[in-house]
């Protein structure tokens, strides 16, 4: 190869290598545009205050047998599994003979000790489930919590009597 040809090939090779470093593969979004794959940042303060769970069954004052089947509807919020945080969404907690939690308070559990204290988590975004309760009178509340079990929205409360 002649000296001129070698110089030309070297110059073309160096130029091609340098140019390839300037061209992206198209997978990365431009720096000034948001990546659509990244979720929006979650801010608890944006959770709706008017989100409202309501007992559909049993009715307030009902006499029932164990296991007690609870059915709940929810307005102004969506239900999503525990562990996921999304504004306008959460999961339900059933409180048996337990005070409701103030907005922003962490609802304990899920754990055996929380259930011993009357706090039951419906962590799978369900709207119905059953509980084994001994005979007696109970005050039952339902409350929304976000993915980290932080209480928000309104609550509903019923009183039931469980018979043998």
Question: Language-model segments: which ranges?
Answer:
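Terminal disorder- and signal-encoded targeting elements
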Residues: 1-89, 98-164
């Amino acid at each position: 190869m002649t000296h001129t040809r070698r110089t030309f090939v070297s110059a073309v090779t160096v130029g091609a290598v340098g140019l390839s470093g300037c061209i992206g593969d198209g997978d990365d979004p431009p720096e000034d545009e948001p990546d659509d794959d990244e979720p929006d940042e979650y801010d608890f303060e944006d959770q709706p205050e008017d989100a409202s769970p309501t007992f559909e069954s049993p009715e307030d004052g009902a006499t029932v047998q164990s296991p007690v089947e609870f059915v709940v509807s929810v307005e102004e919020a969506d239900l999503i599994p525990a562990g996921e945080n999304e504004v306008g969404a959460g999961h339900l907690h059933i409180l048996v003979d337990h005070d409701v939690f103030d907005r922003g308070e962490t609802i304990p559990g899920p754990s055996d000790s929380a259930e011993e204290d009357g706090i039951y988590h419906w962590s799978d975004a369900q709207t119905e489930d059953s509980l084994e309760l001994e005979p007696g009178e109970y005050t039952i509340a339902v409350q929304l919590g976000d993915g980290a079990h932080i209480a928000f929205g309104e609550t509903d409360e019923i009183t039931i009597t469980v018979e043998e």
